[in-house]
Amino acid sequence: MLRNSRIVLLLFTISFTSFAQSGKLEKGKESLKNSSSSASSSTSSPNSKRSSKSSNYTDEDSTFGSFFGELFIKLFAYTAYGVLVETPFEFKGRMHDAEIAHFAYENSTHGNFIYTDFINYSNVRFDFTNNFVMENRNLYGNNFGLDFRFLKRFSVDFGYLYVTEKSNLKRDYFSLYSALLKYHRIRTQNFDAWFGLGIMYIGCDVNKTSFGVGLGGELFVKKPISILFSHKWTNINNEEVHNTKMLLKYHIKKYHISSGYEHFKIGVSKINAFSVGVGASF
């Protein structure tokens, strides 16, 4: 009798432990919902015995300091503009007036941008993508994207990631929405690189919105092949959320097929997924 009760207790413990285990999505979402309360230690500054010394700056010192302060600000602004927007050398180069191509590899010499003398070669362009992502047979989903290009060097990127996971006889879900205003910093006929700022929203019981950043690029190796990389990042309650793509694309006129690797970081959980998808440009 005692032996049978021990067996029953052992089976109950094993089953309870297996059911208590959480999947990646559940663990990740819980880490995003639990805001880490950082104990703000009150810093007592012993300024009681500090003698307030009066600053005896002369007019010459003030003028000297303001001159170098203004010079530093101008130099910083000039450097930042050159790094983020355009340098004087690029202003006179062909990349300055590069037009948006109707679609990648419209001819064999250019990708997303084309050097042309025609005004308004293409005012706008819509790029649609949809990739099926899968880490294993229990964890998979879709990564949908819409990129609206305009004014030669800008675009608005909308993304929707939906992942589902089956664990312990239940199914969990995760959704990530993103909207970024992107500036295409490098616009050559063989390489397109961008950075972007915007917002990202996490649904499925988390329901948090946060500031988001992103960067990426696409290298057009040789028609019809290109290599794409993109990375989007946000922070929720001091936990990071990442959406990273590294894809090989095969272009067929206005359409393409892609395959590669996608990585997702959801708080404490990391997902490494195989990706395959399709896309179109209009």
Predicted regions, residues:
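Transmembrane beta-strand segments of Gram-negative outer membrane beta-barrel proteins
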Residues: F67, L71, N112-F132
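Charged linear interaction tracts used for macromolecular binding and regulation
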Residues: G111, T116-F118, I186-Q189, C204
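Histidine/lysine/aspartate-rich catalytic loop segments that bind and position anionic ligands
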Residues: N190, F195-S226
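Outer-membrane beta-barrel translocator/channel fold
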Residues: Y160-A179, H184, G196-S210, S230-F282
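Outer-membrane beta-barrel channels and translocator barrels
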Residues: L151-R153, I186-N190, F220-P224, I252-Y255
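Short, surface-exposed loop/turn motifs at beta-strand boundaries within globular domains
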Residues: D117-N123, E135-G141, R149-L151
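Cleavable N-terminal export/targeting peptides
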Residues: M1-I114
